[in-house]
């Protein structure tokens, strides 16, 4: 839907720079962001250059695969990942929630994908429900540079 319907529609209605699109997701949407990133060569047609992945729910049970499976499958196909990825959590989120995210970030970093710019940030003073606002502001400034 996003690739085949939403982005083409938005491109018709608005002035869209198709070379610098950003996919954003928070919580389960953040988990989906990892899915989209590691399937970008097959499903997403490399549509998105930037990804904001906020407080991804790594404990999500999909019934099939988890984020590690998607990443492993991608790595078996490719060694480059031409994307900018900004992952955030709030400092007030539980360690049990954040630890799987940090472990997954470490796995990605150890792959040394060429073309990947990966930034992980813990935003002080925010929890799972409040970290989205400062995170999306940071994302827009990073990828579009305007206030």
Please describe what each predicted stretch is.
Residues 1-147:
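Non-catalytic cap/lid and distal C-terminal segments of serine-dependent acyl enzymes
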């Amino acid at each position: 839907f996003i690739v085949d319907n939403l982005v083409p529609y938005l491109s018709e209605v608005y002035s869209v720079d198709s070379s610098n699109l950003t996919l954003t997701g928070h919580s389960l949407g953040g988990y989906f962001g990892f899915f989209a990133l590691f399937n970008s060569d097959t499903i997403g047609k490399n549509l998105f250059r930037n990804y904001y992945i906020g407080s991804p729910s790594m404990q999500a049970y999909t019934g099939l695969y988890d984020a590690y499976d998607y990443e492993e499958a991608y790595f078996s196909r490719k060694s480059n990942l031409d994307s900018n990825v900004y992952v955030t959590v709030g400092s007030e989120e539980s360690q049990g929630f954040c630890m799987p995210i940090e472990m997954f970030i470490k796995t990605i970093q150890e792959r040394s994908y060429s073309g990947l710019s990966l930034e992980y940030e813990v935003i002080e003073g925010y929890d799972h429900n409040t970290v989205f606002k400062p995170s999306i502001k940071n994302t827009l400034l990073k990828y579009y540079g305007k206030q």
